Regions:
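Accessory DNA-engaging acidic/polar modules
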Residues: 1-176
Length: 176
């Protein structure tokens, strides 16, 4: 079985090696978890929540979960950017996010506005529905547009893994 490796600095200054191991599951056979989170995040979060990943994949899933729920919003200008999260008031499902300046007023559509935060959290759609492909499609599209300039940006295996390998894209908890 082919294994993909990458290294990164730990908070103690050591280099950690993460191995992205291709999955053996039928649905995503041959894909690594970084690929799955971009292609089918609903499936990933279901598997994670139900502790379906075993051994090495469980370690990788824990790392992906931490990162997928704390994606740092890229700051391009003078003003700090934040994410506004919305739900569909009719279906009560996740609707999407909008990334904009923190100084902008909160949206007027209070019935659909959920909250504002400084990170992108890919787990949010599952809080509204166990199966929400349209909510995830909107969220992943916004993420790709924010980082790559297009909702249709092709996320190859290398690009998916590079995204999750880049510590600068995530907000990590501070240890006191």
């Amino acid at each position: 079985m082919l294994k993909m490796q990458h290294s990164r600095q730990s908070d103690q200054g050591r280099v950690l090696t993460m191995v992205w191991t291709p999955l053996g599951f039928k649905k995503h056979r041959g894909k690594t978890l970084p690929q799955v989170i971009f292609a089918d995040p609903d499936w990933f979060f279901y598997m994670y929540e139900n502790r379906r990943f075993k051994s090495g994949h469980a370690v990788e899933a824990e790392e992906i979960y931490k990162r997928a729920t704390s994606i740092k919003i890229r700051q391009d200008g003078k003003e700090e950017l934040v994410a506004d999260y919305f739900r569909n008031p009719v279906t009560d499902r996740f609707y999407g996010i909008s990334i904009g300046p923190q100084s902008s007023p909160r949206p007027e559509c209070r019935r659909s506005f959920l909250y504002r935060t400084d990170v992108i959290d890919l787990s949010v759609p599952r809080r509204f529905a166990d199966y929400d492909k349209s909510g995830y499609s909107a969220l992943i599209g916004t993420l790709k547009n924010h980082f790559y300039g297009s909702t249709s940006y092709k996320m190859t295996k290398g690009r998916c893994e590079a995204f999750f390998d880049d510590d600068s894209k995530f907000v990590f908890e501070q240890k006191v």
